[in-house]
Amino acid sequence: MGERIKSTMDLLIYLQNSHLATGFGFNTNLFETNLINLAVVIGVLVYFGKGVLTTLLNNRKETIVNTIRDAEERYQEATEKLNKAYTRLEQAKAKAEEIRVNGLAQMEIEKQELIKAADEDSKRLEDSKNATLRFEEQRAIEQVRQQVSRLALELALETLKTRLNRDLHAQMIDYHIGLLQSMESVID
């Protein structure tokens, strides 16, 4: 460092003595240049300004520390909120999965119930169809029976008309009278 000061001083001396520096030059006389006055003023400023500067720097430091502390608190709050949000997200995912599984189970239950109800309806319809068929069959049989009976009666009447003459008619009357008399004697 001393070498540097010496070279700077040599340069200043050279510039002062050089013919190029006739209008410009450095005054190396300390008393003429008020260097002492400047040093005193700077010293007073440093001595008394040190408190102000220290206060300003301390205030600035405190502001920076408070800002950092606030930023850290906000970071912690944001981290907590993020963790809570992740927790709620996981809970929502779990709830959605539970709802999906329950929905599938409920859907399967309802499917089975619908199949069972359809089977029951089909059985009921089959039973109803069978009952209707039996009823119609019975009705048809009854109609056939009635027609056969009517035709048999008509045939019997026709046969009676053609075969029934006076002698046969008298024999039948006598036969029935005999039956009635035998019944009367059994009753007495």
Swiss-Prot record:
Transmembrane annotation, as ranges: 35-57
HAMAP family on file: ATP_synth_b_bprime
Stated family: Belongs to the ATPase B chain family.
Miscellaneous field: In plastids the F-type ATPase is also known as CF(1)CF(0).
Protein name (Swiss-Prot/TrEMBL): ATP synthase subunit b, chloroplastic
Chloroplast is among the record's keywords: yes
Zinc listed as a keyword: no
Annotated localization: Plastid, Chloroplast thylakoid membrane
Superkingdom of source: Eukaryota
UniProt entry keywords in alphabetical sequence: ATP synthesis, CF(0), Chloroplast, Hydrogen ion transport, Ion transport, Membrane, Plastid, Thylakoid, Transmembrane, Transmembrane helix, Transport
Described function: F(1)F(0) ATP synthase produces ATP from ADP in the presence of a proton or sodium gradient. F-type ATPases consist of two structural domains, F(1) containing the extramembraneous catalytic core and F(0) containing the membrane proton channel, linked together by a central stalk and a peripheral stalk. During catalysis, ATP synthesis in the catalytic domain of F(1) is coupled via a rotary mechanism of the central stalk subunits to proton translocation.
InterPro entries cross-referenced by the UniProt entry: ATP_synth_b/b'su_bac/chlpt (IPR002146)
Membrane protein topology class: Single-pass membrane protein
A Pfam cross-reference name: ATP-synt_B
Subunit structure: F-type ATPases have 2 components, F(1) - the catalytic core - and F(0) - the membrane proton channel. F(1) has five subunits: alpha(3), beta(3), gamma(1), delta(1), epsilon(1). F(0) has four main subunits: a(1), b(1), b'(1) and c(10-14). The alpha and beta chains form an alternating ring which encloses part of the gamma chain. F(1) is attached to F(0) by a central stalk formed by the gamma and epsilon chains, while a peripheral stalk is formed by the delta, b and b' chains.
GO CC annotation terms, alphabetical: chloroplast thylakoid membrane; proton-transporting ATP synthase complex
Gene Ontology molecular function, alphabetical: proton-transporting ATP synthase activity, rotational mechanism
